[in-house]
A protein has these predicted regions:
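Short beta->alpha linker loops
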Residues: 10, 29-32, 74-78, 99
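Donor nucleotide-activated moiety binding/catalytic core segment of transferases
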Residues: 2-38
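Short amphipathic alpha-helical segments and helix-helix/interface helices
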Residues: 16, 59, 105-109
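Catalytic binding pocket for nucleotide-activated donors in carbohydrate/polymer assembly enzymes
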Residues: 34, 38-92
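An acidic, carboxylate-rich microenvironment
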Residues: 14-17, 78, 103
Length: 131
C-alpha cells in the first residue's frame, strides 16, 4: 500500500471481487474488461494502447455512449475530471442493456440446419461480392 493505492498479487477471484465492489475502472480499452465493467455498471476511464485499432475504437465509443472517458495520457487533470463525473457516468450506465448471445445462437442454428447447407450457400454468395 502506498498512499491511496493498494498493490495486490494476481488473483482471479480477488480481481473479480475488486471489480464487483469498485466505484469505477481505469484501464486500457480492451473489449472484455470494458464490457464486464458496463455489465456491472462501472464507469470507465480508458487508456487505449497506441497502435491498437480495436482499443482506439472502444475508447471512442465509450466516450460517445457517455459511460466514461477516453484519454491519451493519465494526467491529474484528466483523472480528476473523470472522478468528478463518476455519478454522471453511473447514471448513464443504468440504461445499459447486455445483449447476450441469443441472436447469434439463433442465426447459427439457422445456418447449420441441413448439415450446414445454408451456411455454405451464404458463404458462396458472400465470396462472389469480394473482388
Amino acid at each position: 500500500t502506498h498512499k491511496n493505492l493498494n498493490y495486490k498479487a494476481f488473483s482471479k477471484d480477488g480481481f473479480l471481487n475488486d471489480l464487483a465492489s469498485c466505484k469505477a475502472v481505469m484501464a486500457t480499452a480492451g473489449f472484455t474488461l470494458m464490457t464486464e465493467s458496463f455489465y456491472l455498471r462501472k464507469p470507465y476511464l480508458a487508456l487505449p494502447m497506441r497502435g491498437q485499432f480495436e482499443q482506439e475504437i472502444n475508447g471512442f465509443l465509450l466516450a460517445r455512449l457517455k459511460y466514461g472517458v477516453n484519454i491519451r495520457r493519465p494526467t491529474s487533470e484528466a483523472i480528476g475530471h473523470f472522478l468528478y463525473r463518476i455519478p454522471d457516468f453511473a447514471e448513464n450506465l443504468k440504461g445499459y442493456k447486455a445483449q447476450g448471445n441469443a441472436a447469434i445462437k439463433k442465426r447459427l442454428s439457422e445456418l447449420l440446419v441441413d448439415n450446414g447447407a445454408l451456411a455454405r450457400d451464404f458463404h458462396t454468395k458472400r465470396m462472389r461480392l469480394i473482388p
